[in-house]
Amino acid sequence: MRIIIFLSLLIFNSCSYQSFDKRVNLINNVNDGSFKKVIYDKGFIDIFSLQKIENRQEVQEVIVYIEGDGLSWIDRFTPSSDPTPVDPLTFKLAKLDQNPNVIYLARSCQYIRNNECRKEIWTKLQYSKPVIGLYEEILEEIAQRHSKVHLIGYSGGSVIAMHLASLDKKKVKSVRTIAGNINPNEFTKLLNLSSYQTSINLDLIDDKIKDISQTHYYGSKDKVIPKEIYSNYQDQYLNNSCVQITKVNASHTKGWQKFWKNNYNLLQNC
């Protein structure tokens, strides 16, 4: 029998469960005021964002960080009351980015209270058409204001980053993933888990972004994402100079800040 289990449960493991307010305070404490809060109202739920926009000229590029699944589950059978991350790692990485224009996008129902935020959204529907559609609209708005967009996804946010990269190849110049679940279908097969409910066709995405600069970072100590996902992806694009798979001395949640501090600007030549 397949068991429904998600990245957030694997990551959560033995971490202490903090209240919503405490988790919100964590990201506020990381922010020194250089990032301003923006709420995207694009549909049935709002999306929380923190943004540093120092140059508003249209010609400027922007770096967009997309959060992982967060705290979706407390244990295998108990959904979290909200999916706000226990550790705002993705925003910490965004803070290390010294580019003038940087946007952090939380996932659906993270860092906000909304009457439409039902548990199904972060336990079953995180990659469904209505939810993914919110990020498609956000990307469209961002692309209207910037001539070049670089996407970075952490953990489960990698799927969304890769999907968005396939939609606007004219504006999206690169996609990078960090400890990313870059193939959820293969992930569920390798671990014998229930499949995600998703509107994303990963086979089509892979073909559409094969000519976009891609770097996929995985941790040598990562116990969450099977390394076979990366080796299989690398084999698929063995002769494609646009795609780079890079091993980092990190686990799924630890070691990335040290690495990112000196490598946030690395892009694969394509």
Report residues per predicted region.
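C-terminal catalytic histidine-bearing segment of alpha/beta-hydrolase fold enzymes
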Residues: 235, 239-270
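N-terminal cap/lid segment of alpha/beta-hydrolase-fold proteins
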Residues: 23-54
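The feature captures the conserved acid-bearing segment of alpha/beta-hydrolase catalytic domains
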Residues: 180, 185-249
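Alpha/beta-hydrolase active-site loop
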Residues: 118-143
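C-terminal motif of bacterial Sec signal peptides marking the signal peptidase cleavage site
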Residues: 13-14
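Short, surface-exposed "cap/lid" segments of acyl-processing enzymes
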Residues: 46, 54-106
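Gly/Ala-rich beta-loop-alpha elbow adjacent to hydrolase catalytic centers
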Residues: 152-157, 161
